[in-house]
Design a protein with these regions (language model features):
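Subset of outer-membrane beta-barrel
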Residues: 10-293
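N-terminal signal peptide c-region/cleavage motif recognized by signal peptidases
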Residues: 4-6
């Protein structure tokens, strides 16, 4: 009897501190901070569960001087169980000055995805299946796009990083991994509570066909333009604590801890995420106060 293996795993890598890592999901963000921004992140998800996701992300984006263009490069490595997913992306954005306050950016993303399966990590009975003998690695290109409205206090965005719905191992009728489009909607607003305290509520909504709706809501405080503290809630999934510190004008570090609210909490001690953002300022763009996203 023939058996067809069909899978739909976690699609794009998951982030709790998405508000600082927007370039990975929305190409229109490229250059929007007005400086060269270098970002690195590591996430260990569901600690204590064997084969749980681990993610490493790196990105660089910058505006092009004397133009409305921005460019970006990013790399994401996402490991889940026996799978290893590497994505390299290039982003280009074009920004229109809508008013003295608001800018609207349009972006496109081109990416290449390298997906591999380590059969040595599979159950021996599964790994020995003749139908999986030709399954090792796969490469697929993709295209994405996004829009991003922003000011010094507000941002709203909509994006689809992966328009092409590729089937991994399509030449093997017994082992099919179907990618799906991920639709992202993000937003946030910064309120000045006092000269030394800022408050920013924010949200991210991710829509994937055939998967539950993901809604992340967060609330963060920034004290003296230095210390960030906050919390977040992922609908029916997790609650999070967030912290960050502006070490210098150009260096910002952050950490978040997720505690599961599902049955996974009985098997996992939570998820950890750390990031570092380094920015290079020129004489014109010298930072007066840090932008809170």
């Amino acid at each position: 009897m023939l058996t067809c293996y069909s899978g739909l795993a976690q699609q794009d890598a998951q982030y709790t501190q998405y508000m600082y890592n927007t370039i990975n999901i929305n190409p229109a963000y490229a250059g929007s901070r007005g400086v060269m921004s270098i970002f690195g992140l590591h996430r260990t998800q569901w600690v204590g569960i064997e084969g749980a996701p681990t993610t490493n992300a790196f990105s660089l984006n910058t505006p092009i001087n004397n133009s409305n263009l921005g460019v970006g490069l990013s790399f994401v490595n996402d490991k889940i169980g026996p799978t290893n997913d590497n994505t390299i992306s290039a982003d280009v954005s074009y920004t229109v000055q809508m008013s003295e306050t608001y800018k609207l950016s349009f972006g496109v993303k081109g990416s290449g995805n390298f997906f591999s399966l380590d059969k040595g990590k599979l159950n021996p009975q599964v790994a020995a299946d003749n139908h999986l003998q030709d399954v090792n690695s796969d490469f697929s290109p993709n295209l994405g796009a996004g829009i991003y409205l922003h000011s010094d206090k507000l941002y709203l965005g909509m994006s689809v990083p992966n328009f092409l719905q590729d089937k991994k191992y399509n030449d093997n009728q017994y082992a099919v991994f179907q990618e799906r489009m991920n639709f992202y909607f993000i937003g946030g607003y910064v309120f000045d509570i006092s000269p030394s305290i800022k408050f920013k509520p924010a949200f991210l909504t991710k829509v994937v066909t055939g998967s539950p709706l993901q809604v992340d809501a967060s609330a963060n405080f920034l004290f003296f333009d230095k210390l960030m503290l906050g919390g977040a809630y992922r609908w029916d999934a997790a609650v999070s604590a967030l912290a960050g510190f502006q070490v210098t004008d150009g260096l910002f570090i952050g950490y978040s801890y997720d505690m599961e609210t599902t049955k996974l909490r009985h098997y996992s001690s939570g998820s950890h995420e750390v990031f570092l953002r380094f920015e290079l300022f020129n004489k014109v763009s010298k930072m007066v106060s840090p932008r809170f996203f």
